[in-house]
């Protein structure tokens, strides 16, 4: 099963055929189980978009729910891959969230040029020697098509290698006539009790 138009860019550019595999497995799963609702994390925004398009294109009677991206207290997006980072790499990896956060500040200050936002995020990540940036992209949240101007719902997506570990992260930017809102996910409280909105 192939979902055209959503899989060529972002992670798909470095992982040929990956999302065709995802779409095929998910289509089989939905066919066997017949769920009314399915939950996918927003951290892998491209996968979520692919699954939503799959369900729509095949007219599957399933609601696809995006679950909030969850962060560690220091901002690093939660992932099973984090355990493979050394202590130095783990500390360095927080630059990914820092880049997104600084990008969010730029948007909230009024920046609407996607190229400028992309450069701001990328420049922050390249300050960390242990981090090798794969991409920092600004795309339409639904189609994943590159955008030039920030308007409507936009996804700022990042992929980077820290040591041998590949990490992804993103934030959603909503821009309308009233201004801009930014969704960086939710952050686990330092005590581990509950979740609090990210800022």
What are these regions (language model features)?
Residues 1-2, 76-85, 147-153:
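Short, surface-exposed amphipathic charged segments that create phosphate/polyanion-binding patches used
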Residues 1-39:
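Divalent-metal (Mg2+/Mn2+/Ca2+)-assisted nucleotide/phosphate chemistry catalytic cores
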Residues 37, 44-134, 139, 197-199:
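Glycine-rich, Lys/Arg-enriched anion-binding loops that position phosphate/diphosphate groups
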Residues 3, 7, 16, 57, ...:
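Generic secondary-structure boundary/loop-capping signal
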Residues 119-199:
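Phosphate/ribose-recognition catalytic cores of enzymes acting on nucleotide-derived substrates
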Residues 14, 19, 43, 77, ...:
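Gly/Ser/Thr-rich beta-alpha loop segments that engage phosphate groups in nucleotides
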Residues 21-32, 81-84, 105-115, 175-182:
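Noncatalytic linker/hinge segments flanking ATPase motor cores
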Residues 23, 47-50, 172:
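Hydrophobic side chains within alpha-helical segments
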């Amino acid at each position: 099963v192939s979902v055209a138009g959503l899989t060529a860019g972002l992670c798909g550019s470095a992982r040929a055929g990956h999302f065709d595999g995802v779409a095929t497995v998910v289509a089989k799963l939905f066919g066997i189980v017949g769920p009314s609702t399915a939950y996918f994390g927003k951290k892998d925004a491209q996968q979520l978009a692919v699954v939503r398009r799959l369900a729509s294109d095949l007219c599957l009677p399933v609601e696809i729910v995006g679950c909030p991206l969850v962060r560690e207290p220091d901002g690093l997006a939660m992932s099973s891959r984090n355990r493979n980072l050394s202590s130095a790499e783990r500390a360095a990896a927080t630059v990914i969230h820092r880049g997104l956060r600084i990008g969010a500040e730029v948007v909230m200050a009024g920046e609407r040029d996607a190229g400028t936002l992309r450069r701001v995020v990328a420049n922050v990540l390249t300050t960390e020697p242990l981090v090798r940036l794969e991409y920092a992209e600004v795309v339409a949240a639904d189609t994943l098509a590159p955008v030039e101007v920030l308007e409507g719902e936009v996804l700022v997506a990042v992929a980077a290698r820290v040591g041998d570990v590949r990490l992804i992260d993103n934030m959603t930017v909503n821009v309308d006539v009233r201004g801009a809102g930014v969704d960086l996910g939710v952050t686990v409280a330092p005590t581990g009790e509950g979740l609090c909105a990210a800022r």
